[in-house]
Amino acid sequence: MESSGSSKVRWGQNRRLNFIDVRLQYDGRINRSDLMQFFDISAPQASADLGLYQQLAGDNLVYDTRQRIYLATPEFKPITKRSEATRYLNELQRLARGIVEPDESFVGYQPSTGVVVSPSRAIEADEVATLLRAIRDRVALRVRYQSMDAPEPQEWVLSPHALGFDGLRWHARAWCHARQVFRDFAIGRLDVLEHVFSAKPVDPLLDEGWNNEVTVSLVPHPGLTPSQRRVVMRDYGMVDGHCELRCRKAMLFYTLRHLNLESLAISDVPAQQHVVVENAEEVKQWMREDRDGLQHLRR
């Protein structure tokens, strides 16, 4: 269901089957008008889509003649990845943040939803467009950048090759021609001044921190009770008592900071730190190898 077909018709039909699956999974019901209103299709087309879904997963739904709707059966089993809980909850978050409009989302009934708010980053569309084109065309840029290590802005010639998100802000991953190093530059702190076509192109494959991945292994805090450890393992989706997070080496500190584990210390209060880093010595070595991690990204 997730892969698109060879034509627009096939892709559209797959999307409508996904819609049916999601609505049955979470709303427990669907009717023709749901499909007709969301996709702007005819009643015969909606009936055909519901009929096809019945052919694919007949045990998932039953028609209630009194209510004139299809109801999910107790034996319902989703047939598409769109019905996964994580994707559904992410969609609720996007709706709550206003990233998507209700008429663009497969979510039917939307419960009252609250999300942690973050400052709105002042990033200009023109700056992002310029960075994207520089990455695509392998062109260097002269920028004015305000580092947190310097009292005043400085000008640098950068060759950006990727974008990264640390959970709060977006960064441009770029080669700094003056310092001869790959670094992260917060997009909201830079102003593009001009293109520098004379700068020597830099191969992004040389950025070992970006191209190499590392694995952080998390385990329950040793001070938790057996019952607490079990619920933490379930909450984090642990297998055999631990879960593994793979990330780019250059994103390692961001990942740890996002989990409030950047110090790698084990708290004396397990209730405040549910998990600890199992391979802390490995992580320390990776952090030492990455200059940005060693400096704790103070820029």
UniProtKB/Swiss-Prot annotation:
Induction: Represses its own transcription. Residues 197-299 are annotated as: WCX domain. Keywords: Antiviral defense, DNA-binding, Repressor, Transcription, Transcription regulation. Residues 1-84 are annotated as: Winged HTH domain. It comes from the Bacteria. The keyword Nucleotide-binding does not apply. InterPro entries: CapW-like, CBASS_pafABC_assoc_protein, WYL_dom. Transmembrane segments: none annotated. The gene is capW. GO terms for biological process: defense response to virus. This is DNA-binding transcriptional repressor CapW. Has an N-terminal winged HTH domain, a central WYL domain and a C-terminal WCX domain; the WYL domain of each subunit reaches into the other subunit to form swapped domains. Homodimer. One of its GO terms (molecular function) is DNA binding. Transcriptional regulator of a CBASS antivirus system. CBASS (cyclic oligonucleotide-based antiphage signaling system) provides immunity against bacteriophage. The CD-NTase protein synthesizes cyclic nucleotides in response to infection; these serve as specific second messenger signals. The signals activate a diverse range of effectors, leading to bacterial cell death and thus abortive phage infection. A type III CBASS system, part of a CapW-Cap6-Cap8-Cap7-CdnC-NucC locus. Residues 85-196 are annotated as: WYL domain. Pfam families: WYL. Residues 145-189 are annotated as: Probable ligand-binding region. Residues 120-200 form the WYL domain. Changing D235A: No change in promoter DNA affinity.
